[in-house]
From Swiss-Prot:
ATP binds at residue 539. A motif ('HIGH' region) lies at residues 43-53. The keyword Protein transport does not apply. The gene is valS. Keywords: Aminoacyl-tRNA synthetase, ATP-binding, Cytoplasm, Ligase, Nucleotide-binding, Protein biosynthesis. This is Valine--tRNA ligase. It is found in: Cytoplasm. The keyword Aminoacyl-tRNA synthetase applies. GO terms for molecular function: aminoacyl-tRNA deacylase activity; ATP binding; valine-tRNA ligase activity. GO terms for cellular component: cytosol.
């Protein structure tokens, strides 16, 4: 029996424990069942889930539960992305160990990561996440690192991996190179500096504009637009850089924007991506003025050792003293920052470094073509990937100057030759392991280990191969081969908008290059979570809400409904009032089933399910099956928000407020046949509503199932039952019309009772309904209206009622007449009382009435009085309500 009170903190942990103990979600390879493999996102092991995780992973869980109910064999593992700078920083801070002790440092990284995994797994379980935890994977596992290294060896064989010096995105704060996908432009306030550069021949100056005067020591050219009349005569000349007394050429290039600043810019190696393009296009020298730590180097001359920001300020001051800085304009401009890690956000420098690359730029057309074969939800998210692919300036930098990461499976010699690891030795760590050979097989030189580690996206970009056991299948493992063939390409990749250009892009590329196939059939994209104030959640805004703040108060199911209301591809604000509403909805659901339990728990539905039902039963079941059809179609499109709103509205209003209220008189009445039909409809309705809700709110539906249905059905979980079957024969448009009519009429009668302070079950002695077009339909539901509203005498007539409106009282507006007539007011009141009808008529006709009291003229307008009217039918006073063509008379 369902307890009186809905308490999610009581029921939710109980069922989470039950699901784990009974292995309800255990995946077993079954080649006779259709496969549905989900390439779940492995969150970085920060130690705690945020609401973004809750949103994305609840979506995934809804899909998994739905697909199981549709008969699919759902492969639903969950992994954790372990490597990365935040863990290294945490270990340095927590344990006081530096990277100079690599083995001890790595040991502590692994130790801390395991603690984070344990905490996050508990949080996943607490939101009702139905992964098969026996398939959990971690990117720091040896077998996982071996698979990543195997994929790199395959790329090396294909000629896709190389090492060279190239300008890379460099984070001075993190002291490592970054991929383009890890950086982004942030709009900020800054200054545009206008500087006069002297011409080398002494004939004058050329004015340039720059946001970075500190890069002057790295200037290698000045550029103008070839059609700019202001500077055409200067092309080919040289300028002499102030402070450094070095000459650089003035060149013309169409990439210059003549409308920016002065229309002339200097080319420094390297201020931005455009500087790289010009340096390569014109084979200009490379001068580096910035160190890895973000300080100026010896090429900066008198500014060496200063931080970039300090050097910018000092060189601007010196140029101003020299009379060469003639304007400093405050502007908003875009600054390149380390955006992937909100804990960093440092400005990025472009520094030439010896780095490892995967060739990807040559394959962007191929990647876009493969991506187009995937079904994108929403469709326009494909364009984000396409735009990203087409904007790439150089290949994927995969090396990171860190410690905790998957090692490269390579050694190098001093002549630059690459020595790959033997496959049978994987995983290897060149920092600690012996190389496969003593000398370089190409030139005989000494061999050195590659001490860099891999970009974490190299790890996570093979997740669809990891979960389908590609790494075992290619070794000849027969079971793994079957597993891979049955599950790859995977059915679904769920992920956020923020990692389309990283996880989605790199996974499509890497998987296709390794298998010749797309990684998934569908990809569904969720937006980001905003704070209650609509802004991005941030500690600096003070608008961060943690899942652990929400669940103890409202439970996981109420929070899950909040996630389900998020539109695909759009940002979704967290609103406390939404979760509160969801909780009240679940209380309503609880009360519906508590009411129904006594009527249908022991009812033999199978015996009576084909009985001819009454109009309102047919109405609610017709509406139910329309909802089933809609929910099924929209779940296939991953539009949870549309289903959730429709389902909540249907349950709260049509089921709880209307049908159940209109069926109570039958369930408690003496008409056994009518009671039987009501039970058939109520059972079919609530059994299927439970199934429709199950993927969204798994805990409350499991509680309901065990309390009301399990004894008859036998299956050990609601989540092992079949999805509701849409029945075309249940669609009844005539019954739906009758149901809507009953709702409207009953609603008006409820309003009448409320306005008179009557309980909803209070008796109405006499009600008459008049209608024209609706007359025949009203006669069909006459019994339901009378029974629902407890009407002693209900009459339904065809036609319009004969009504008489009478003036029964005219009252004065004391605030208006008091100041005007003072002592006469009591006499005026008496006059109004005795002549109410004639006074009201005259005011209606003339807008005013005039009369005398004790010889003094009194004039009243419609604003001075309140006219009370009453309606009579056949001499008896009535109150009326009108809905459509229907007039309701309350006697």
């Amino acid at each position: 029996m369902l307890p009186k009170k809905y308490d999610p903190n009581e029921i939710e942990p109980k069922w989470q424990k039950y699901w784990l103990e009974e292995k309800i979600y255990k995946y077993r390879l079954d080649e006779n069942k259709p496969s549905y493999a989900i390439d779940t996102p492995p969150p970085f092991t920060s130690g705690t889930l945020h609401l973004g995780h809750v949103l994305s992973h609840t979506w995934i869980d809804i899909i998994a539960r739905y697909k199981r109910m549709r008969g699919y064999n759902v492969l639903f593992p969950q992994g954790f992305d372990n490597h990365g700078l935040p863990t290294e920083l945490k270990v340095e801070k927590e344990f006081g160990i530096t990277k100079d002790q690599p083995e001890e440092f790595l040991k502590k990284c692994v130790e801390w990561t395991w603690q984070a995994i344990e905490a996050m797994r508990k949080q996943f379980i607490r939101i009702g996440y139905s992964a098969d935890w026996d398939l959990e994977y971690h990117t720091m596992d040896d077998w996982y690192k071996a698979a990543v290294q195997k994929s790199l060896l395959e790329f090396y064989k294909k000629g896709l991996i190389y090492r060279e010096e190239h300008p890379v995105y460099w984070c001075p704060k993190c002291r490592t190179s970054l991929a383009k996908a890890e950086v982004g432009y942030v709009e900020e306030e800054g200054y545009l500096y206008y500087i006069k550069l002297p011409l080398a021949d002494g004939s004058g100056y050329i004015p340039i504009a720059t946001t970075r005067p500190e890069l002057m020591p790295a200037c290698v050219a000045v550029f103008v637009h070839p059609d700019d009349e202001r500077y055409k005569h200067l092309v080919g000349k040289k300028v002499k850089l102030p402070i450094y007394e070095r000459e650089v050429p003035i060149l013309a290039d169409e990439d210059v924007d003549p409308n920016f600043g002065t229309g002339a810019v200097y080319n420094c190696t390297y201020g931005d991506e455009q500087d790289i393009v010009w340096q390569k296009r014109y084979n200009l020298p490379v001068i580096i003025a910035i160190n890895e730590d973000g300080t100026m180097n010896e090429n900066a001359g008198p500014y060496a050792g200063l931080k970039v920001e300090e050097a910018r300020k000092k060189i601007a001051e010196d140029l101003e003293k020299m009379g060469l800085l003639y304007k400093k304009e405050k502007i908003k401009h875009r600054v390149l920052r380390h955006t992937e890690r909100s804990s960093c956000m440092a400005p990025i420098e472009l520094l030439p470094k010896k780095q490892w690359f995967i060739r990807v730029k040559d394959f962007t057309d191929e990647i876009v073509k493969v991506a187009k074969e995937i079904n994108w939800y929403p469709e326009d998210m494909f364009l984000r990937l396409k735009d990203w692919a087409e904007s790439m300036d150089w290949d994927w930098v995969i090396s990171r100057q860190r410690v905790f990461g998957t090692p490269f499976p390579f050694w190098v010699c001093k002549n630059g030759h690459i020595i790959p690891a033997r496959e049978e030795d994987l995983p290897v760590d060149p920092r600690f392991d012996k190389p496969p050979v003593e000398k370089c097989p190409v030139c005989g030189a000494e061999i050195e280990p590659v001490t860099d580690v891999l970009d974490c996206w190299v790890d996570s970009s093979i997740t669809p191969l990891i979960i389908t056991r590609w790494h075992e299948a290619i070794k000849g493992d027969e079971e793994a081969k079957k597993w891979f063939e049955h599950n790859f390409p995977t059915a679904l990749r769920p992920q956020g908008t923020d990692i389309i250009r990283t996880w989605a892009f790199y996974t499509i590329f890497r998987t296709f290059k390794l298998t010749g196939k797309k990684p998934w059939k569908d990809i569904v994209i969720n937006g980001m979570v905003a704070g209650p104030d609509g802004r991005k959640m941030s500690k600096s805004y003070g608008n961060v809400v943690a899942p652990d703040e929400v669940i103890p108060k409202y439970g996981a199911d109420a929070l899950r409904l909040w996630t389900a209301l998020a539109p695909p591809g759009e940002d979704h604000p967290f609103k406390w009032e939404t979760v509160d509403y969801n909780f009240r909805f679940l209380q309503k659901v609880w009360n519906i089933y508590r009411f129904a339990e006594r009527h249908i728990k022991d009812f033999d539905y199978e015996k009576y399910k084909d009985i001819e039902l009454e109009p309102l039963d047919r109405w609610i079941l017709s509406r139910l099956h329309r909802i089933i059809k809609f929910a099924t179609e929209e779940l296939e499109r991953y539009r949870f928000n549309l289903i959730t709103r429709e389902l909540m509205t249907f349950i709260w209003h049509e089921v709880a407020d209307d049908y159940i209220e209109m069926v109570k008189y039958r369930l408690y009445g003496d008409d056994e046949e009518s009671k039987l039909k009501a039970k058939v409809a109520l059972y079919e309705l609530l059994y299927n509503v439970m199934l429709l809700l199950a993927p969204f709110v798994p805990h409350i539906t499991e509680e309901i199932y065990h309390a009301m249905f399990k004894d008859k059905i036998g299956e050990k979980s609601v989540h092992l039952l079949s999805w509701p079957e849409y029945r075309e024969d249940r669609i009844d448009e005539k019954a739906e019309k009758l149901g809507e009519l009953a709702r409207k009429v009953v609603s008006e009668m409820r309003k009448y009772k409320n306005s008179h302070g009557m309980p909803l079950n209070a008796k109405l002695e006499h009600v008459a309904i008049y209608a024209l077009e609706s007359y025949d339909d009203l006669k069909l539901i006459e019994k339901d209206i009378a029974g629902t509203m407890n009407i002693e005498k209900l009459e339904i007539f065809k036609g319009e009622p004969q009504l008489e409106e009478r003036i029964v009282e005219v009252k004065p507006n004391y605030k208006r007449i008091g100041p005007r007539y003072g002592k006469l007011v009591p006499r005026i009141v008496e006059h109004l009382k005795n002549n109410a009808e004639s006074i009201a008529r005259e005011i209606k006709e003339n807008g005013k009435v005039e009369f005398e009291i004790d010889g003094e003229k009194v004039e009243l307008t419609k604003e001075d009085v309140m006219i009370k009217k009453e309606v009579f039918s056949e001499g008896e006073r009535v109150e009326t309500a009108v809905v459509d063509d229907i007039v309701i008379l309350f006697f």
